Amino acid sequence: MARKKLKICMLGHKRIPSREGGIEIVVEELATRMVALGHEVTCYNRSGHHVSGKEFDQHKNKEYKGVKLKTIFTLNIKGIAAMSSSVFGGIRAAFGKYDVVHFHAEGPCAMLWLPKLFGKRCVATIHGLDHQREKWNKLASTYIMLGEKCAVKFADEIIVLSESVQNYFEDIYGRKTRFIPNGVKKIEIKSAGLITEKYGLTKDSYILFLGRLVPEKGIRYLIEAFKDVQTDKKLIIAGGSSDTDEFANELKELAKGDERIIFTGFVQGQELEELYSNAYIYTLPSDLEGMPLSLLEAMSYGNCCIVSNISECTEVVEDKAMIFKKSDVSDLKIRLEEACNQSEMVKVLKNQATEFICSKYNWDKIAQETLNLYRGNI
């Protein structure tokens, strides 16, 4: 088949460029690389502002690094925004002149049938089993399950990010999927400057969690475990609350009385780079993940990581990280104490991390694999 240049539409994310979540990073990395390879890519951004506040809005132009940006009407109401943008995005994609429409996340796939009806090749990436997340109300969870079933029935290809999700679709639906993981890129280590000014942090003086403040990330366990660890190191909890302000307030209440625990809110740019670059360890205590980009990024910065034993984490780190039993506060406490007391072990894991993760997960290779999947019947 001739290698024709493709017209591609991506939707299901909030906005690019942004770090509002892992999906936004994935869409940006794929879209910009596909444009660099000569394809035409359009991304449907939600209307409205960054979930952590309009002060974090980054880009309002109609193009970003060659990627066309179109704003999709969105009802900016908690629990409704994702649904409304996927409905209007699905309609617009159906009538657009695209070879491929790529839906990201389960919920938006509820509209996948419409572009498919209009003859588009439709691909779905399942970034995680979103209906299992605590934050969704009954309406949102029902819509997400509808999206999952639509993807199974109508998608030409389904991409999954972990073996456990691949097994889920095979066991529940008998549906074959393609495993194409997320990627990571090599970075430049930054010395502590801004984070010293803002939080008094220096190299190796803190344990880092970075991600959205949502229940399934296991932050409750992390705070409870850390409070019982005898260490001078601080615990930095970096991330925005998204649709879950109530949960973020619950976490801050739980952390009360321990001045070592610092909530930074949403971070990006230099502050984010410095936090990754200077952490003693990075921890991801999640109960539920798709494929955690923050974990890939943390390892690319040469971090020793402590992760829960869910397969989505263990498949990434293999034997290059410390692992604790999911949801087990006492086991997490033991791992934190081991890390704080065994600096040589931490140093060994730090030294292995960057080369291991950057050779295993390469964005250029992943973009090409995705394009090969797009070309299936075109």
What are these model-derived regions, one by one?
Residues F266-V267, E274-A279:
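Short alpha-helical donor nucleotide-sugar binding micro-motif in glycosyltransferases
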